[in-house]
Regions:
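Helical scaffold of the NTase/Pol beta-like nucleotidyltransferase catalytic core
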Residues: 1-25, 63-84
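Arginine residue identity/basic-tract feature
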Residues: 15, 36, 41, 51, ...
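Active-site ExK catalytic segment of metal-dependent nucleases
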Residues: 43, 57-59, 87-89
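Acidic side chains
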Residues: 37-39, 87, 117
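N-terminal regions immediately upstream of nucleotidyltransferase
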Residues: 1-5, 24, 32-35, 52-57, ...
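Ala/Thr-enriched low-complexity intrinsically disordered regions
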Residues: 136-138
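Conserved catalytic core of two-metal-ion nucleotidyltransferases
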Residues: 64-113
Length: 143
């Protein structure tokens, strides 16, 4: 399977999790050779960034355990799915647009799960679903 399709499939899972399109950015987008990793970024609306509870983006990589855990987890998932050295990060929109002016290639256009001809998720509901609390589950009785 071509690496681009694998990267798009990974992007579909990221999109489902965060409710936003992820972007392929950096040197691997612009050059066929000379890159060391594949940068994938989710750019959240500034209000969504706040709702997720992330801290100041200038210090997030050193102080925000939730941000670090999500970046590590999605980087590992991306490496497993694509075989590429994925560097995944989450960024707030205003900050990202100010700091990074390079090309962005949208990912996540390959649906990751199908039932017949119909995707099992509704892209129109992704944004609200990504920020909704998980439903309460009944406690399990001891066996």
């Amino acid at each position: 399977m071509p690496a681009e399709l694998k990267l798009q499939a990974f992007g579909a899972y990221v999109r489902a999790a965060f409710g936003e399109l992820p972007y392929h950015v950096g040197s691997s987008l612009e050059n066929k050779t000379g890159w060391r990793d594949v940068d994938v970024r989710v750019i959240l609306d500034d209000d969504d960034w706040q709702r997720w509870g992330f801290c100041d983006p200038d210090y997030v990589g050193h102080r925000d355990e939730k941000w670090i855990a999500l970046c590590l987890a999605f980087s590992a998932l991306g490496r497993e799915m694509t075989g590429l050295p994925i560097d995944f990060q989450i960024q707030p929109q205003t900050w990202a647009n100010k700091k990074f002016r390079g090309m962005r290639g949208a990912l996540g256009f390959v649906p990751h799960s199908f039932v017949g001809d119909v995707p099992v998720y509704d892209p129109a509901k992704l944004k609200s679903a990504a920020l909704s609390p998980a439903p309460a589950t009944a406690e399990r009785s001891p066996q």
